[in-house]
Structure formats: structure tokens, C-alpha cells
Amino acid sequence: MPNEDNELQKAIENHHNQLLNQDKENADRNGSVIEDLPLYGTSINQQSTPGDVDDGKHLLYPDIATNLPLKTSDRLLDDILCDTIFLNSTDPKVMQKGLQSRGILKESMLSYSTFRSSIRPNCLGSLTDQVVFQTKSEYDSISCPKYNKIHVFQAVIFNPSLAEQQISTFDDIVKIPIYHLKVSVKVRQELERLKKHVGVTQFHSLDHLHEYDRVDLSTFDSSDPNLLDYGIYVSDDTNKLILIEIFKPEFNSPEEHESFTADAIKKRYNAMCVKNESLDKSETPSQVDCFYTLFKIFKGPLTRKSKAEPTKTIDSGNLALNTHLNPEWLTSKYGFQASSEIDEETNEIFTEYVPPDMVDYVNDLETRKIRESFVRKCLQLIFWGQLSTSLLAPNSPLKNTKSVKGMSSLQTSFSTLPWFHLLGESRARILLNSNEQTHSPLDAEPHFINLSVSHYYTDRDIIRNYESLSSLDPENIGLYFDALTYIANRKGAYQLIAYCGKQDIIGQEALENALLMFKINPKECNISELNEATLLSIYKYETSNKSQVTSNHLTNLKNALRLLAKYTKSDKLKFYVDHEPYRALSQAYDTLSIDESVDEDIIKTAYSVKINDSPGLKLDCDRALYTIAISKRSLDLFNFLTEECPQFSNYYGPEKLDYQEALKLLQVNENASDETILKIFKQKWFDENVYEPDQFLILRAALTKISIERNSTLITNFLLTGTIDPNSLPPENWPTGINNIGNTCYLNSLLQYYFSIAPLRRYVLEYQKTVENFNDHLSNSGHIRRIGGREISRGEVERSIQFIYQLRNLFYAMVHTRERCVTPSKELAYLAFAPSNVEVEFEVEGNKVVDQTGVLSDSKKETTDDAFTTKIKDTSLIDLEMEDGLNGDVGTDANRKKNESNDAEVSENEDTTGLTSPTRVAKISSDQLENALEMGRQQDVTECIGNVLFQIESGSEPIRYDEDNEQYDLVKQLFYGTTKQSIVPLSATNKVRTKVERFLSLLINIGDHPKDIYDAFDSYFKDEYLTMEEYGDVIRTVAVTTFPTILQVQIQRVYYDRERLMPFKSIEPLPFKEVIYMDRYADTENPLLLAKKKETEEMKQKLKVMKNRQRELLSRDDSGLTRKDAFLESIKLLESDTIKKTPLKIEAANDVIKTLRNNVQNIDNELMKLYNDINSLEEKISHQFDDFKEYGYSLFSVFIHRGEASYGHYWIYIKDRNRNGIWRKYNDETISEVQEEEVFNFNEGNTATPYFLVYVKQGQEGDIEPLKRILK
């Protein structure tokens, strides 16, 4: 045995040297890829040592698992069937990748997978009958004959179905290219025996054969000009080696193609007929005859088994040979030898064609190569012959010829089964692939190809392929993950889906699609250089136009940002997209299960309750809260949000900015005062459009940073409360409060209201009139001076002058004091409440320097908060603090003591700064003052307004006199409008009686249940049909002829309950808008407006009919049943057992039930229609006058009463347009900033209700100046 091993090793080395010389020659010519490798390998269990003989028990390629491409047998088979299609492709994209020159056998799946689905693959054609000649061979290994075997399989590659479509004549057949496949599989049987079967085998591409394999595959020549493409693959488990070779078609020269055409055959036959008269010219050979003759010529030497058998030669004069082909090609093209002999009897020379001797092809490698070429020729002739036979007509006489029968007898098949047999696949796999219908179109999907996966692979096999490819090719892991994800979803495989979910990987396709969603070309950018700021900026821009972004596009953008956040490992991007506010505000409120009208405290409570009940909805609740905070622009809600979700502070905290960045964001410099910074911040916060959801968080972070750097108490308090703390402001930056001097805080509201009206305030502050001035004026004018339609007495004038001076002193103190609040004089309160017909006694002495208030020198400052029991006027809202403290006045002792150091009393102790007043001091006793305050508590606020304005008018000189000698002055100019009332007899419409009246305010009635302020105005100005003794039936119309500068609207809320004999207050909400338009109520001749009014009236009548019908259908009878309920109860009764036992016929009962059900359905249908029609009509009515905006008014003041008719508390909201449109709440000495939502709070059950609204005409908003402070 040792001698045999030495001889074997010597034989191998000799053969190796021959191969080296051959390779050197090939390399010089073509650059061979086959290189020499060390003679060692690795055992499955142990490492072998260099120089060992191949004993068949060692791995020759221990590191093959690190090679790419990695393919399975299914993938290799599909590559074989598609390779020539790529090589012949003219697709520019295929050519751009060079696949038309290289083929795909050695290429990565990623390079060609996208083209595969559009390719119709070839078929694998093989000879089934191995008796005729063998296309399958088995050889012992030269390097390890004991254990290793080489299996060789030859077949053809073409698409018979496509070929049949392309041929219409016999001449077309030779144009069909039939390619040839040779597959050599070296099996290491000992390693296969020890193999652990763990699923689908993975084969890795091999560039360099091991020496032991080169010996066994020495017929392989990469430089062979007939070789189109090849690939060498080795399994990672047993090193099973597959050598795939694809060859060009045989008989591929033009002259060979032409020789099989009908013309060439006929010409050749006719030529032989001339030489041989025995031939019949009408019996021209068919193409099948030619193919079959040539097939027999090449088959002959393949069937010779031993040298003992005689060699079958061909006579050169053979008629079939000479008529079916050019006999010279046997020697010039096909390797035959011509042998000539002389006949001794005739001296004629006989020539024979001797085929190559192929008996020793097993041992002689050159002979083996020749044999394989003959096999290829035979196979091509067989399949050409069968194509040619298929063109014969069914009744063709050629069907019975020897050639056709011979070709038909050759058993061929188009099946992939031989491939799997060759590779030794498992029986189950072979059975699976034995049925061609089991092949799935999924196998042509790019994602399946990229993972070298077939549709029937188990989840484990797919995962193994993914892991191997990802490990070998990490740069393309994204593409492999795309493939895995697609396969998992396509197959619906739970294990795969779960596995994908555990992978922290971004698919390449998903990544590129995400970038394309962001309009970034992945081919033109370096993805690793994209930062979160850029991506977030693009996302904000793409989602900014809500009207153009569809829900699907938005979803895709969000998913793209999530994916990019994961890819860039950006926690901020992930947080941003997860917490992005809802697009629809209603969704946020629905998430928290609250109504949009609730206040912020309820929102916070609802949020806390929701997350406590459903912790899993924490993220949804965070988004909802975030959405509402943005909608309300509520700093308080943002504070609550960051407390409940600290992640917001992590990404939008002040530490993310430096001081200069914070200043830059607010567009201020470092020298700006805190007040200026807050002013600009509030402009940005409340006035700027919402372009980016997180802009409020960024602004808040910037302001917080500034507050920290400056250690600013003012900014810190603002950040905590959302309002400016007046105590932190310099006095000149905040209005002055007014102390309550006796539960008359509606007087304080009224005084603040008048102070905010700049023209009136300036007039009062500049007032210098005396009684003598008026006497002189009246003497010179010659007019009878009337106010409110009556003459004014001297006493009233003198009293009014004193009132204006008291008011002037208060206003002066409010402008110039350094304190937070001032206390009005009791004389001012007395004169404001005491009716104008009550005479006031003054001291005789006048024209002297007096204090600012003009009070008696012995008067004392009082601050009473006593509660009074009064007789209540049945139409008034009373300002009364209850003893139990409920609904009480805010001006309590505690509050007053708290602000005592900030109070400034307008009294004789104040430095007057030289104000002179040619007035006399009113002599008012304590009892008179108490009585006046008592009257004030019983008065409606409008009575006080009338009293105050009457005194201002009485103490003012007229600008002019109207026709009725009514004084026209600043009060009339600011507050009064006129209406025209027309009485039109229906029987004589030309006899119209009109009356023009002045109005100070419009009274709207909440008792009519108006749905909004326009609905209330409609009731006020609606036409009324009356019956008058003088005219009979008439229509009364009211319209505004002159609109005031300041429009005052009184809301009637107190009514008298005649059953309970007591007043009550209606707290029904009356929604009002910040801007209203009064065009529809104007006295006009505009035909368009008149037509709209008429149309609207008709629509309202129609609406009234529909609502009456709706009420009728929903009304309940004495038993509490609606009409529908009654029908249902009747049905229930008729279907009961009681009725069934009565003599009543079943048919009649069924008819009644059917009728009742129809009635129920009809009611439901009618109610649904009424509901829709009413909503539609109300919506249309609400927009009837949208185009009429000549008389526009802007809201600036809202008087509030909280409590019931018999007690409660007053305050006022005033808007400051000069300070970013903020609303302030004036609650006696306390003035605070409030959010707009507090002013426009129309919640049901809210006892703090508006009762007096004040609007200013658009264009004159500058006349409203709530803040006026001048400090020295």
C-alpha cells in the first residue's frame, strides 16, 4: 500500500506539472483565472498538514464560507437558465452593469435581481434515454479515487415555447440558438457521509481551484473560445464542488446554417442527381433527413464500447452523406480522418471517413473533451430535429419516414429534475421539483433572488441565508434586510416576521424610499452625512402645507422620518415623530374624552385621569395634550406637558441653547429690558402663525434660558403662570387698580372702562369748566340746552361739574401714581350713584386751591367691607358680598391689607401738584353717602352708566345743538347712535310713519335663547306685525341710521319668577365674536343687502317650520312616550303572547305590525332628514352676510357678573391692542393678564356671565388705550 500511494502521488505531481505548463500557455494567451494553490486542506474535525495526499476526509476549502457570491442549488439552476439571456441582452441598464459581457453565473444576486422578473427563462433539455448514447457520466477522482467521484451531466438550454413562436418555416429552425450546458459535480463521499444535514446547502463562489480538484477537472479550459460563461461553486459543509460551463451552439457558422435550408438541400440533391442518375429528382431530402443523418454520423463513435469493436467508417460515396451534408466538413470541421485504399482488381481509389477513437475517454482527458463535443452535436441535432418534425403537417407523408420516426423515438424532456439528481438532493426535494407546476413566480421576485431563496424554503433556511449574506456583505445588509422583510410579509410567516422585528436594521430599499420621500436622491448624497437638523427641517417643510398634504402622504412622511431616525440613531427625530401633534384638534379632545369648550384645569385633570386609567395610552395622551397646548397657545399647558413628559425638556430644554442663541431666537439684543423681551416673546407666541409644531417649545426654551442667565423674577413668574405679574413690573408698565370702597365694584369696572377710552380720558383730565362758563355760554347761544330731552337746571350743572372734577382727580391719580392702586373719593361714588334729580349742597366759598378730591377737610378715609341687606330691584344684578364668603367680592380685608403698601388714596393728604379747581366742596353727610351706596347696590349697571354719562354731558359745553335743542357733545359723539322706527300699514304701504331715536346701548334678550350674538340682534331688529287702532294691521321695522363710535350691548339676564315671586338670573351662554358686522341692521337702500335680508327671512321661516315639525315628532305625551315610542310599544304588544291567544286573526296582526314598523322607519327617516336639513340651513344662514362688511366693530371690553340675581361680584375684561392684544382682568385693586379663552368662555353652567359688551368701530381701535401711566 505505501508503494501504491507513492506511485499515485508521483502520478499526480507529473500531471500537475503538465497542467502548470498548459496554464502558463493559456495565461500568456488569454489570462487564465486558474492558479496553483497549496496542497493542503482542513478535515471536518481536524486540520491536515501540508503535503498530505488527498484522502477524501479533509476540507480543501476551509474558508469557503467567507466567499461571495453565496447561492443555493435553486439559485444556480435559475442562473443557468437565464445566463444566455443576459449575455444576449440589449437592455441599456443590463449593458450598463456589464452583464451582457460577463453573464450572471459568477455575479452577485444584487447585480441582476431587478431584471429577472422581466425575463422569460430558458428550459433545460436533456436526453432521457441513456441507451442511445450517454449524456451523464461518472468518473473516479484522480486525486482520491477511493472516496471522491466526479459526475458530469450535459444538456441543452433554450426555450422551446419561444422557439415554436419564432419559427414559421424550416429555414427558421437553424436560427434558433441552442446553448449547451455541462455540469461537473465532484462529490467527496466520505465527507458527505459525515455531513450533518441542516437544511438547504449553501454554495460559495470559488476563484481558484485546489490542486487536487484541478487534476480531476482538467478538461475545463476557461480560455476555450466556445465557452460562453462558467462558474465554480463549493458547498461550505462538505466542499461539494460544482463546475458549470455554458457553451455556444454547435453548427454555428453561416455555411452550416445555410446547408440546412430548403434551397441548399435541394441544390445539393440536384447536384447529386446529375452525378447519379438512379436518384429521383422529386424525392428531395427533408431537413429532418439531414439532421438525422448527421446525428447518426456523430452518434456512431459514441456507441463504440471497446477497441475490439470495429470502427464504423463512412464511405465517401455514400448517397445519404453526399445529399444530406457537405462530406468535406467531416474532416475539416468535425475531426474525422479520410482514409483511402486502392482496389486491386479495378485500381479504383476508395475513400472512407474514419471517426475519432473515443473508447478510452475515461482515462484520456483529450479524448473526453472530443467526446463531450460530439455529445453536444448530437443533442443539438436531436432538438433541432424535433423542432423540424413539429412543423410537419399532421397528414404529411414525411411523418412516416425513417428519419422522422428515428427522431421521434429519441426520448427527451424539459425538466429540472436531472439537476437535482446530479446534486444528490434529498428525495423530498426531488419529489417537490419533479412537478414543474410547483415552481412559483415568487422565485423571480428580486427580494427572493437577493437572499438566494426559493418559495418552498423553510423559515430557518431563509434566516440562515440572510445571516450568512449579511455577515459576508455588511455594506449591503440593508438590501438583505429589505429582502427578508418582504419575504416574511409575502409569505405571512410568523417566525420570519418576529425575527425581522427583533433586528435593529434599516433595509436599503426602505432607506432609499425614505430619502426619496424627503426628495433626496440616495444616489447623489452621502447618507452618513445627513444630520437630524437637516432631516427635521425637510420634514417640517414637507408637512407644513396641511391643505396639500394628503393623509396617505403624511403617513408615508412620518414612516420615513421614523426610519431615518432609526438609521441615524437620532432619539430626537424619533421623539419628534412619535409625539407630533394630531392634525385634527378634535382627535386630541376625543383622546382625552373632553369637549373643546372646557378650560385648562379640566384638560389637565382629564389627562391625569386618562393615563391613570389607561397607562398604555400615555403617548396618545401626551400627543393630545401637546396638540391642545399648541391650539390654545397656553404656556400653562406646556408647563404641565413638560412636567408629565420630561422628554420634552430633554429635547427642548434651555440647556440646549446658549444665551446668544436664545436672544437670536427672540430677535432681541442683550441690552433689551425684561419687559421688552416679554413683549416680543408674546408677539411671537400669540400673533405669529404656527408654521412648526415645536416652535412654542423652542420659544419657551429660549425665554427660559434668558430668564436663567438674567436671574429675572419677572420672566420666571411669566413662565410659571403665562401672565405678567404686575408686582414684578415697574408701575409705568401696568394699569392702576381701584380699591373697592363699599361693595360697588361694578363702579370700579365702569371707571376702568371709561379710563381706557382715550378721547374721554383726555377730555376729563383737561377739564377746567365752571358754572359761570355755562351761564355765559347759554346767554350767548340763545339755545335752550337739553340733555336726554329735558332742560338742565343750574343745580344739576354745578353738581355735574363737581362730579367731573372728582373723576378728573381719580384719572390723574391713575396716570401719575407710583402705587399699584388708588382709592376713589366717596364723593365720586356718591355723585355716581345718586340720581341726577337729587340736589347736592355745596359750601359757599369757591375759587380756591383745593385738594385733588375736593372732599371736606374733616372727612376721613374709610375702608369698609360690610355686608348689607337690601331690597332688591327685580331687574338688576346686585353687587353684594355674602356673609358666608361664597361668590363674594374680591376686595376683602386680606387682599386690601396685602396691597395696603401699594394703595394711593385720592384725598386731602395727597400732594396736589398744584391742581386748581374753581369748584365748591360738596357737603355730604355720612348718612347721605351710605344711602347713595345703598342705591348703587340696587341699581342696574346701565342706570349707573346713564347717570355718569348724564353728568359728564351736563358738565360739558355742546359741540352743537340738534334740531330739538338736544346737546351734541363728546359723549354723544362716542356712545350714541340713532335708529329709525317705521310703521307701515299693510293696507296702505305708502303711508309710512317714521321716528328717529337715539340709543346709548342695544338691549338683547337672553330669554329668547339666541344661539349667538347675531341671533340676538336678529330678534332685536326683527320686523313685528302689530294691530294699531289708527292704522289697523301694520309692520314695524327698526334699523340703525347712525352707528356710534363705541357700540354698547347690554345682555338682559335678570327676569322675575312670578310663581316664586323673586328675580332669577339666566346663565345661558351667548356666544359672541371678537369682530362683528352690523350691515344687516343698517337702514339701507342697497338692493343686494335687501335681497339677502329678504332671502334670510324666508330661510328663517322655513327653518321655523322644520324645527316645529322636529319638536312635534320628538314631543312626548302624558305617558312620556314619543310618537315613535308609542308605535314600538304597540308592536311589542301585538307580538306578545297575550295578543296571540286572543281571537284576533294572525294575518291582521301581522299587517298592523308591518304598518307600524313602516311608520317607525318613516319617523326615523324624517327625523334624519330634518336634522340634516336644519343643520344645512342654519349653516347657510350663518354665512348669508359674509360679503357685507362696511360696519365692522371690534370687541374691547366685557363686563362680567358672577353669582345670582340677588348677590354676586363684578369685574371687567379690557383688551389692550397696544400690548400684543392682551386681555386684562380688572378686579378692583387687582389687575391681571388672562388668556383669551377665559374671556370667550361659553361653557354651560358658568355663573360668571357677560352682561355688557363694548365694541369699537373698526378703524378707531386706536382710541382704546387701557394703559396710560406717566411717572416723574
UniProtKB/Swiss-Prot annotation:
Q: Which residues form a coiled coil?
A: none
Residues bearing Phosphoserine?
907
Under the heading CDD domains, the entry gives: Peptidase_C19J
Tell me the disulfide pairings in this chain: none
Q: What EC number(s) would the UniProt record show?
A: 3.4.19.12
Where is this chain compositionally biased, Acidic residues type? 902-911
Report keywords, A-Z.
Answer: Hydrolase, Phosphoprotein, Protease, Thiol protease, Ubl conjugation pathway
Source domain of life: Eukaryota
Q: What happens when the gene is disrupted?
A: Increases the amount of polyubiquitinated RNA polymerase II subunit RPO21.
What's this chain's function? Has an ATP-independent isopeptidase activity, cleaving at the C-terminus of the ubiquitin moiety in natural or engineered linear fusion proteins, irrespective of their size or the presence of an N-terminal extension to ubiquitin. Hydrolyzes polyubiquitinated 'Lys-63' polyubiquitin chains in RPO21, producing mono-ubiquitinated RNA polymerase II. Removes ubiquitin chains that initiate proteolysis of FZO1 and inhibit mitochondrial fusion.
Assembly behavior: Forms a ternary complex with RSP5 and RUP1. Interacts with RSP5. Interacts with FZO1.
Protein known as: Ubiquitin carboxyl-terminal hydrolase 2
Q: Tell me the organism.
A: Saccharomyces cerevisiae (strain ATCC 204508 / S288c)
Originating gene? UBP2
